[in-house]
Amino acid sequence: MKLKETLNLGKTAFPMRAGLPNKEPQWQAAWEQAELYKKRQELNAGKPAFHLHDGPPYANGNIHVGHALNKISKDIIVRSKSMSGFQAPYVPGWDTHGLPIEQVLAKQGIKRKEMDLAEYLEMCRQYALSQVDKQRDDFKRLGVSADWENPYVTLDPQFEADQIRVFGAMAEKGYIYRGAKPVYWSWSSESALAEAEIEYHDIDSTSLYYANKVKDGKGILDTNTYIVVWTTTPFTVTASRGLTVGPDMDYLVVKPAGSDRQYVVAEGLLDSLAGKFGWESFETLASHKGADLEYIVTEHPWDTDVEELVILGDHVTLESGTGIVHTAPGFGEDDYNVGTKYKLEVAVTVDERGLMTENAGPDFHGQFYNKVTPIVIDKLGDLLLAQEVINHSYPFDWRTKKPIIWRAVPQWFASVSDFRQDILDEIEKTTFHPSWGETRLYNMIRDRGDWVISRQRAWGVPLPIFYAEDGTAIMTKEVTDHVADLFQENGSIIWWQKEAKDLLPEGFTHPGSPNGEFTKETDIMDVWFDSGSSWNGVMNTKENLSYPADLYLEGSDQYRGWFNSSLITSVAVNGHAPYKAILSQGFVLDGKGEKMSKSKGNIISPNDVAKQYGADILRLWVASVDTDNDVRVSMEILGQVSETYRKIRNTLRFLIANTSDFNPATDTVAYADLGAVDKYMTIVFNQLVATITDAYERYDFMAIYKAVVNFVTVDLSAFYLDFAKDVVYIEAANSLERRRMQTVFYDILVKITKLLTPILPHTTEEIWSYLEHESEAFVQLAEMPVAETFSAQEDILEAWSAFMTLRTQAQKALEEARNAKIIGKSLEAHLTIYASEEVKTLLTALDSDIALLLIVSQLTIADLADAPADAVAFEGIAFMVEHAIGEVCERSRRIDPTTRMRSYNAFVCDHSAKIIEENFPEAVAEGFEESDK
């Protein structure tokens, strides 16, 4: 027998190398085979509910790292709730209608207008479902636990029917109307867009300063006066029908030197404008308030059939331009709102494809709208005072990445103004994480216009509206309920397969159709109405779910998207928000803080991460970042996270190995019988349990990450385990000292495995498979630990905090001795502590082997007054380090004066000899194999 065989060296097959890319799919297959999701739901049946509603990602292409951040975050929350005694199902969803799928088919050469519509829509449906399958596999590879076999998809007939019911309820309350207001118009998509479908980019535009000649000055201005206006969209001059001034702003009539014309500009902008126009000097002829100029008539710059009226508007500012805004009601929301008050013509001179129409004039007809600036300049002639290129933020279609325009076209709207205050009141009742989200959503709702819900596309849910012979729109409850029932049975495809009369209730009549003829709407709904009514199609209808949901969690862009649309529809129909709380997250950027794009080559694919590092590394990264703000990720950052993971894994491996002979049923030592340092570690660990429990409640994953890393590296590796191994290795296997520490080891191991399961489910499942004494087959079926408190806890923590200060001081003294070549390793040291009475009292109160805790072979405690001059001194304490006396025990590796060769061929100290002689009689009788001595 070898001497080292008398040591209790930890044994485990749990590997140091994780091998996550290969092992994770095996665990996922095992979970699926065991129906773990279903079993967890059955375990929690009847318990308090927690329902997170999944915002549906768009079903197109593989998932990106933003999807991963979102789904992993949701999974962490739902798993933690499920293991904490909540009935917490997770129904994933997909958004499956909309333009991107039409664009994919177009790229494949499929031409919608050249084929049967029903056939085209079926191709869209099949493509969408194929993308759902692709993304489902991607999400499952991340270890996300969900009801994957029963997701919700917005193309499902039941969902479409429930969406129609939401529309019908809003229509019944009068919240749906048709209007010709300007809307965001995407010429590249040939459709109206909602605010949530807009993104902004900085572009260069040519801005023009030009003048309208006064035609009727109303006794205030003479006819040789010109009113100066500014535009950044020259094409809209073709539809200009008014000039808007600020009613309380001051305007001057000035005559530049050498000019026979006089001009009107805002007083606050005159100096800057004079420089632009080359007016070296000018004479001020008069001053007027904007309100004085109301109803003055001017000539259109070139269209002699058009007069432009001076009107008043509160949106005019002195921030730029001339203080006078040319007003084209067909091309802007402010222009429309102020123009309709004065009954200005709503002229629209651009068609759905972005081409100038016939009523723009023969010089413009057929030209692309943003190519006509040279024509406008030519038509203005000497009325053009200046032009300049400006860089400004401009709206783009978020799908096609092309600029858009405001354009007045007949559209269907959902009113927001009718119940805006109700929505704002509901926002104030909602909990927001982070808290600034409340202000953001509140301001968006407060400032937004009505919601344009119609789209001039094919792939989507039809607007369930019929028209009588006299043009009256029909959307009564009877009609929408009937359409909803048809959609539920057949899917929305029936809208395109049947004539209007066959879609209406049997025997339906309307006074506007004396001949019984009806037509149907051909526009579809905005896809934000699809997902925005999911509270009804999912939370309000699916078994084991509830409405309102406890939580919506999405990226911060959803304040103007899903959070917004869901809130509007829910308040409109039921008077309350669809959620109790909102958690928003920042965007995922690359390692340099830049947006990811294919062109930059900086995209991080979750699938690539899973193949290289494993999904648990990506999950740990999610827990490591502050998602309240934008977060960064790169392969280098993931490499750093992987290193942290390795430290956690190897520490837990140590605990597994050193509890391999521990049976909690027979070997556990009661808290009252633990050693002082073991009690201290038990208290510290339970504080960690409390911290993690609270952080899960607050959805603060980063707090969990920091707390776990600190506990593993500082409290365990750098302190407790550093000296505990000298006990668990050296003391007799069944000794009280060893079982005390194993009790703490096992308690930490089991509980931290449970606590980490929501974040690292694959790793903790692997650990759990080595814990043969635990009853649950899978850790996911276990319950979260509950933090305990202990008598005199604060006093114990205070005493050990003081010891930690002493320990740091002792380590400095040992380091100085090491540098002076007095010792090599700390176990070569004889440490003398010269202590004040206060420190002596502390050391006595700790009731511990201080030499063991400081990892020195010998320790002496003396009076502070006896400290030599060359001692390493601190306030109330000093240290002297000398080389320990004696020989190194081959078993304990400590220097001990009792170390000597024993009759059984072991060069050991008296303490090790006693353990050997009591526990290994055969080895004592036969002698050990050859010693080094």
Curated annotation (Swiss-Prot):
Chain span(s) of sequence motif 'KMSKS' region: 595-599
Gene Ontology MF term list: aminoacyl-tRNA deacylase activity; ATP binding; isoleucine-tRNA ligase activity; tRNA binding
Enzyme class: ligase
Motif, 'HIGH' region: chain positions: 57-67
CDD domains hit by this protein: Anticodon_Ia_Ile_BEm, IleRS_core
One biological process term in Gene Ontology: isoleucyl-tRNA aminoacylation
GO cellular component: cytosol
Annotated Gene3D superfamilies: 1.10.730.20, HUPs (3.40.50.620), Ile-tRNA synthetase CP2 domain-like (1.10.10.830)
Keywords: Aminoacyl-tRNA synthetase, ATP-binding, Cytoplasm, Ligase, Nucleotide-binding, Protein biosynthesis
Domain of life: Bacteria
Residues annotated for L-isoleucyl-5'-AMP binding in this entry: 554
Keyword check for Methyltransferase: no
UniProt EC number: 6.1.1.5
Residues holding ATP: 598
Catalyzed chemical reaction(s): tRNA(Ile) + L-isoleucine + ATP = L-isoleucyl-tRNA(Ile) + AMP + diphosphate
InterPro entries registered for this protein in UniProt: aa-tRNA-synth_I_CS, aa-tRNA-synth_Ia, Anticodon_Ile_BEm, Ile-tRNA-ligase, Ile-tRNA-ligase_type1, Ile-tRNA_ligase, M/V/L/I-tRNA-synth_anticd-bd, Rossmann-like_a/b/a_fold
Subcellular location: Cytoplasm
Subunit structure: Monomer.
Comment block on domains: IleRS has two distinct active sites: one for aminoacylation and one for editing. The misactivated valine is translocated from the active site to the editing site, which sterically excludes the correctly activated isoleucine. The single editing site contains two valyl binding pockets, one specific for each substrate (Val-AMP or Val-tRNA(Ile)).
Homology family: Belongs to the class-I aminoacyl-tRNA synthetase family. IleS type 1 subfamily.
Protein name (database record): Isoleucine--tRNA ligase
Species the sequence originates in: Streptococcus pyogenes serotype M28 (strain MGAS6180)
Lineage: Bacteria, Bacillati, Bacillota, Bacilli, Lactobacillales
